[in-house]
Amino acid sequence: MQTTRRTFLSAVGAAAALGAAGGAKIPESLAAEPRAANVPASSSEKVLFWVAACTPCDKNLKFDEELYKDLLAYLKANGADGVVVLGTTGEFPSFSVTERKKVAETAFKHRNGLNIIVSPGTTNFPETLELSLHAEANGADGLLVVPPFYYRRPRLDGLTKYFSMLFEQVKIPINLYHIPFATGVPISHELMHAMEKYPNLTGIKDSVSDPKVYQDFVAEFPKLNMRTGTTENLKYALDHNMGAILAEGNNFTKQIAAVFDAKRAGKDLTETVAKLEAALKLLRAGGVDEYGPMKYALSLQMGTRQFYQRPPNSDVTDEQKTKIKEALEQIKQMG
């Protein structure tokens, strides 16, 4: 996982009870007022904020459906337009195909107006297609598809055939996922151009922090939604009427939503982006750069029992817990 980009919503109270009983409702003090009017959540709407949602497990490392329901409600209440289900932050490689279907079905059941993009990618085409068709049949608004990984440097013709097979069998909007530091397989401009013949090519998620890489994507494909996956490129994305899919949205839903609200209101983004970056810096310094600490911080923010993750991702340490609580308190003082 890239530097795990999470932190805190300004409405968060001080450290909430970790031992809250299962399926706790969102504390009223943490739930932001819904927007006066929902932003259209169609896949053709570009300037939307998707959270790359984490996937909570219980202490026995089973998918925690109740906590996931609470998480979706929390993200919606604090301003998210949509979520990506089982992306990198959602730990998709840690779940079986059957489990991934259950997680997606839980999201569909409790979407409450959220735009839902499912990440169905695997190392092989049959399972990727199976998960894609399942998402399509159950009401997904779109897909975010990672390239097949493990094989070293597959050629353009092989990747073109792989994605063409998918586009020819799935009709909902499809976005390609550029995260080469994790997959070893970049999404090239040539591959994107090869897919442009399919009308349901919607765009990408670019999770590379390099501004030039992202800016080149935007310049080359201005009609598609070239969503940024990093806060470093957020202002540039919004300045060019593109969306974002952000892992930081788990812990910073409200702050990121404020940036999008400023964009929609035609306001200058400098102040809201600076406030977001300051809060991000504090929690990152507090140790939230792994799944365990990120999920621990989120459980404090939501006031629920602890979110767990599966190995090989490590549990949060006592030292990290202390630092996270201190960072959350500092962020609270920022207002």
Which residues make up each language-model segment?
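Structured C-terminal cap/extension of enzyme domains
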Residues: A16-L18, L238-G335
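Alpha-helical structural signal in soluble globular domains
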Residues: K102, T106-H110, H134, N138, ...
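Catalytic alpha/beta core domains of metabolic enzymes, predominantly
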Residues: A182-E277, L283-G287
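Flexible loop residues that form catalytic
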Residues: G13, C54, T88, P148, ...
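N-terminal secretory signal peptides and thylakoid transit peptides that target proteins
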Residues: M1-A15
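N-terminal carbohydrate-binding accessory modules
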Residues: P34-S43
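Signal peptide processing junction and immediate N-terminal pro/mature segment
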Residues: A24-R35
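Active-site beta->alpha loop and helix N-cap motifs at the rims of alpha/beta catalytic domains
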Residues: S42-W50, P56-C57, K62-G184
